[in-house]
Structures are given as structure tokens and as C-alpha cells.
Amino acid sequence: MARSGEAGERVVTIESFQSWLDAYGSAWETRDPQAAAGLFATDGSYQVSPFVEPMRGREAIHEYWIQIARTEQNVKFGYEVLAVTADFGIARWWASFVLIPPWSDTKLDGIFLISLDANGNCRSLREWWHKQQSWRKA
């Protein structure tokens, strides 16, 4: 598999991966679509489920995060790095938020497979997750 950096250069390190995950969590928790999209390479891809086509390009990812910011409140995000190679980082992640409407408390628990370029921007993000929801009474 070809690497994104110079020959033999380790593109994904534990430090670059954790830094990216911290910035991703901050963008989500603050509901900042510009910051979220800015974490991706201009031609980056983001696949939120193995059953849907990935979003391609920073603009498509930005549009997705605009919708997220409109429909989620009180977001909390955490992660645990599981593995890092020169090409990919793998992390377990979890998040909780209130989905609006219909005002449901939502928890997600999932896995990220992420590749970064030499500048620390995400070239591709694939995720798998499970959801637990409880509906608030009116």
C-alpha cells in the first residue's frame, strides 16, 4: 500500500492521530461545521456507515456537519486509540447528545478507521457505530 508521505515516512503517528481526534471531538462538541470540515483534505472522504456512499470533498463534508450542528445539542465525545500504523489510525469512540427534534437522548459507540496526509488532514474516515436512544416525555 502506498503511503501519503515521502518514501518511508510515517504519516500517521500516535501524536498526529490523537491531535486529529481531539480536534474532531472539539468541533463536534462546539457544533462547528467549519472546524469539522477543516480537518479533512480538500479531496478527503467521510463514510458514516458501510451501507452508504462516502461523502467526497471538504464541501460535502461541511454540508453534512451543518446538518449535524442543527440537530444535535449537548454533545460529549471521547475516544480510545486502539492501533496506529504508518497509514491508518483505529480508535474506539463514543458520543452522547440530545437529538432535536424529537428530543431524544442519544448515545453512540463506534470505531473509526482514519488515514491522514502529511499535513495532518484526514484523507479518509470510515466509521461503524451502534446507537442507543431514549425518548424524552413531553
Name these PLM-found stretches.
Residues 8, 45-56, 68-70:
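A short gly/proline-enriched turn/hairpin at secondary-structure junctions
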Residues 16-27:
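Solvent-exposed, amphipathic alpha-helical segments
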Residues 25, 50, 81-83:
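Structured beta->alpha junctions
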Residues 27, 39, 68:
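Short alpha-helical functional segments enriched in proximate histidine and acidic residues
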Residues 30-45:
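Short, well-ordered alpha-helical segments enriched in acidic and aromatic residues
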